[in-house]
A protein has these predicted regions:
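A conserved structural/catalytic subdomain of Rossmann-like adenosyl-cofactor enzymes
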Residues: 1-242
Length: 242
């Protein structure tokens, strides 16, 4: 289990040292290290969690497993090192699942986070994507508001992973080919079915609804015209120097 720092302050010297280590260990850091970027708050920083993630994957045995807390942006990134790592893990079929957590779930960061589960023995298996972003309840924690998962919330997530059953608007169970078709996205929401509800109406019911819509629109148009006239009238009364 790992909760690496996401984007800490990083000096040029620190970045140069990391770059030198990465260059000497291409097997451990096959996708290199993220660039040093300017930040108004801390000066310069780097998305160092991507370096930690590569190191963790390299450290695992052939049947190794890991749970890693990452910024939720990682699961949908379409470019850069983040996308390359995610694509690599999916191509290798080492992903077991992802839980996208509610906002403000951690005291140390306001960044939305997800937990990535890696299992090198999951080749040919299924992947569970769980959207827990709407779960839990908000409470005051000192000066900040945090969101807390209840024991029952936690059990729902655990049961979904263990049973590998999809839950409407909550979780999906996929094979790796399905994930590849969605540009390697690990966001559960991108796989939820879009439902369109249809209502059968009789001719009389249809006519009644249409008349109601027309009446409402006419009322809105009239209110808009009244407001427009009022504004124009007040503008006419404005004079320079008043």
């Amino acid at each position: 289990v790992s909760n690496p720092p996401f984007e800490p302050q990083t000096s040029q010297n620190e970045w140069d040292e990391m770059k030198a280590i990465a260059d000497l260990n291409p097997d451990r850091f096959p996708f290199g290290i993220p660039n040093l970027i300017k930040d108004k708050r801390v000066g310069t920083k780097t998305y160092i969690y991507l370096t930690f993630l590569q190191h963790i994957v390299w450290s695992l045995s052939d049947i190794g497993r890991a749970a890693i807390v990452l910024p939720t942006g990682f699961i949908t990134a379409s470019t850069g090192i983040g996308f390359k790592i995610r694509k690599y893990l999916i191509e290798k079929q080492w992903i077991k699942g992802v839980v996208s957590m509610p906002s403000n779930i951690f005291a140390t960061t306001g960044t939305n986070v997800s937990v990535l589960f890696i299992d090198k023995s999951n080749i040919g298996g299924k992947v569970v994507l769980f959207d827990a972003s709407k779960m839990g309840e908000e409470r005051n924690d000192g000066e900040k508001k945090r969101r807390y998962l209840s024991k029952s919330d936690e059990q729902v997530i655990i049961d979904s992973f263990n049973s590998k059953n999809s839950m409407e608007d909550c979780s999906v169970v996929l094979n790796f080919d399905q994930i590849k078709e969605k540009n390697y996205s690990l966001s559960a929401g991108q796989y939820f079915d879009i439902k369109i509800e249809y209502f059968e109406l009789t001719p009389d019911e249809f006519e009644t609804k249409m008349n109601s819509f027309k009446t409402n629109l006419s009322s809105l148009f009239n209110e808009s015209k009244t407001l427009e006239d009022d504004i124009n009238s007040q503008l006419e009364e404005l004079k320079y120097g008043d």
